[in-house]
């Protein structure tokens, strides 16, 4: 092992110059924009502030015309009328542009982007997304977007999170608001199996929103999960939300997914980030393999 004891200088130089960055802990140190997985946070912010209700609907024509230039939905022909659950399922940009706009206008009726992003940042922090996770090794500090309430609402703007942050975020969502400080070590035992140290995750905070809010976002994620064939065909009742995020036009989009199962009694949460992974289908396939491993399907 060239990394054990005295390190081979030439080998270390080779690793440090490798474009695949093998010395980087991608799960804790690499950050990307989250893309549409942030729409769950936007939904919670909208529902809890009263911007949204169970029946609140926005019409998606394919573009958001309250600002110029008008940002587009990923479905250029539009989704038609969307509520919060169907908007999570369909990942409708225009619905969430409206939420971002209305959050920014909620103070005095005038559009104030900084006010809108500050609300989303508050919920991102409470959900454990925009704060450090507390693990035993170094992690990079996450950043909640502070520009363009409209773009921030769909997970663009200046959001920067690691896969670790997304894992903590979806765990909080699955737990209906219990946010944990994450740990890599559950417990330490001696050679005879006697407990030396209990290192179970501790509660950081709880997110005080209504049961209706949790029910709506869980339903939206359940509906979304049922549209992802490689997850739905497993039969594990997986709730999920995917995302693709563009940071540079010269590089492929990032692919993300947050998920938990089973959606009616969660016991496992999975987050996947594929930097420059092109499309969310790549992240979905990886998540499916994690679930198959967890449930032992890959051993059958």
Provide a role label for each language-model segment.
Residues 195-202, 286-300:
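Short, gly/Ser/Thr-rich active-site loops of penicillin-recognizing serine hydrolases
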Residues 166, 279-288:
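Short, charged, low-complexity patches
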